[in-house]
From Swiss-Prot:
Species this protein is from: Pseudothermotoga lettingae (strain ATCC BAA-301 / DSM 14385 / NBRC 107922 / TMO)
Family: Belongs to the ATPase alpha/beta chains family.
NCBIfam families assigned: atpD (TIGR01039)
Reaction it catalyzes: ATP + H2O + 4 H(+)(in) = ADP + phosphate + 5 H(+)(out)
GO cellular component, one term: proton-transporting ATP synthase complex
Localization: Cell inner membrane
Highest classification ranks of the organism: Bacteria, Thermotogati, Thermotogota, Thermotogae, Thermotogales
EC number(s) given by UniProt: 7.1.2.2
SMART domains given in the database record: AAA
Protein name: ATP synthase subunit beta
PROSITE patterns linked to this entry: ATPASE_ALPHA_BETA
Gene3D superfamilies: 2.40.10.170, Bovine Mitochondrial F1-atpase, Atp Synthase Beta Chain, Chain D, domain 3, P-loop containing nucleotide triphosphate hydrolases
Function: Produces ATP from ADP in the presence of a proton gradient across the membrane. The catalytic sites are hosted primarily by the beta subunits.
Domain of life: Bacteria
Length: 469
């Protein structure tokens, strides 16, 4: 028999509910209350037992219309998410309800969103590289299959476009499933993503789960777990390799901070919740490879005021296997994706995993770019003429490498007018190796801008030569 209680206090999204002594619900249980204003069921999640047979719960939708004394029913279980192939191509909210107006979801099962991480004995320890087809990532910050990758960057440097390109490449080139969690981002961006995925034909391999900026903090705080639960089903039951995108993990922390303050907890550093590390760990530890399949997670991380030492990005760092740093300076040069080749790293940039040739080319590229960076002060003060012949050559090659790290994206075709390019890792390594060896010293640097493979750069140089003549 489900326990029943009644509302005794409402403060914004926080609702206190009183139960009989023997019917007190567990922490994280979902409670249901019918909103008299619209007749819809509102889900509350129990967060605290505050004494006097009263629980403090956080609402996962607006509490407008609720009044004291309304009856609340304990469902006896946590929030559940629909899982299985029936959710592919659909848009859900935090409680698994469809928000795309395409009718009910034919779920194969319903799983609770609070689940333990896989046991250490179930996890897979071999490391495999996940090919993305994006040159700068595959060369300098390769993604491990089943790993966690962070996209760091301030506002407007291209995190979401990069995420969309990855979804497209994995769905079309590798026929993989993707789960996208829109955590506290703009509703317009979610709508754009859905429409663009329909155009690109990748929607049938993707599930979109949204808890957007306008929603209460409870929804934004839990939507990542709903998406992760859907991904876990594909991994554990269907044995698939799944890509989980979280845009934006900072908003997950921000929502947690709001919930924490509303629950009356004492804030910690910079006003964040005292449970920051635990909240992050509960989400991140479930993202891993098992013997059955893998979940590779790509997380866009907004860096507040471009300060990478802020507790939110700093806590996320400790969980990551690779970090892709997007730089405003590179975006200002018009080079997209605006990935910083010197700040972006990966734990698997190791000859034992990627092979000697790839490793040496990657380190060679970073060495040339670092030398160019060191020389920029001299160039700014004295000009190129004061450099040695060797340094002049390094500057020329570095500028070509910088431009060759750019790439036209499929999802940006309608903005740029350039056809998107998918570049295999072997072609990426070959191209940069040839630039480092000086095979293309005679080509103009603009030939390397916004092309795919090195052969395309050579063809572009021929065209430029022809048009100049």
């Amino acid at each position: 028999m489900a326990g029943k209680g009644y509302i005794v206090r409402i403060i914004g999204p926080v609702v206190d509910v009183k139960f009989d002594e023997k019917e007190l619900p567990d922490i994280y249980n979902a409670l249901e209350v019918t909103n008299p204003q619209n007749g819809e069921k509102l889900i509350l999640e129990v967060e605290q037992l505050i004494g006097d047979n009263t629980v403090r719960a956080v609402a996962l939708d607006s509490t407008d219309g609720l009044t004291r004394g309304l009856e609340v029913v304990d469902t006896g279980k946590p929030i559940v998410a629909p899982v299985g192939k029936g959710v592919l191509g659909r848009i859900l909210n935090v409680v698994g309800k469809p928000i795309d107006e395409k009718g009910d979801i034919q779920a194969e099962d319903y799983w609770p969103i609070h689940r333990p991480a896989p046991k250490i004995t179930e996890q897979k320890t071999e490391i495999e590289v996940l090919e993305t087809g994006i040159k700068v990532i595959d060369l300098l910050a390769p993604f491990p299959k089943g790993g966690k990758i962070g996209f760091f960057g301030g506002a407007g440097v291209g995190k979401t476009v990069l995420v969309m390109e990855l979804i497209r490449n994995i769905a079309i080139e590798q026929k993989g499933f993707s789960v996208f969690a829109g955590v506290g981002e703009r509703t317009r961006e979610g709508n754009d993503l859905w429409l663009e995925m329909q155009e690109a034909g990748v929607l049938e391999n993707t599930v979109l789960v949204f808890g957007q900026m306008n929603e209460p903090p409870g929804a934004r705080f839990r939507v990542g777990l709903t998406a992760l639960t859907i991904a876990e089903y594909f991994r554990d039951v269907e044995g698939r390799d799944v890509l989980l995108f979280i845009d934006n993990i900072f908003r997950f922390v921000q929502a947690g901070s709001e919930v924490s303050a509303l629950l009356g907890r004492m804030p910690s550093a910079v006003g964040y919740q005292p449970t920051l590390a635990t909240d992050m760990g509960e989400l991140q530890e479930r993202i891993t490879s098992t013997q059955k399949g893998s979940i590779t997670s790509v997380q866009a991380i907004y860096v507040p005021a471009d300060d990478i030492t802020d507790p939110a990005p700093a806590t996320t760092f400790s969980h990551l296997d690779a970090s892709v740093v997007l730089s405003r300076k590179i975006a200002e040069l018009g080079i997209y994706p605006a990935v910083d080749p010197l700040d972006s790293t990966s734990k698997i940039l190791d000859p034992a995993v990627i092979g000697w040739e790839h490793y040496q080319v990657a380190r060679g590229v970073q060495e040339v770019l670092q030398r160019y960076k060191d020389l920029q002060d001299i160039i700014a003060i004295l000009g190129m003429e004061e450099l040695t012949e060797e340094d002049k050559l390094i500057v020329q090659r570095a500028r070509k490498i910088q431009r060759f790290l750019s790439q036209p994206f499929f999802v940006a075709e309608r903005f740029t007018g350039a056809n998107g390019k998918y570049v295999p890792i072997s072609e990426t390594v070959k191209g940069f190796k040839e630039i480092l060896e000086g095979k293309h010293d005679s080509l103009p640097e603009q030939a390397f801008f916004m092309v795919g493979t090195i052969d395309e750069a050579v063809q572009k140089a021929e065209r430029l030569k022809g048009s100049a003549a």
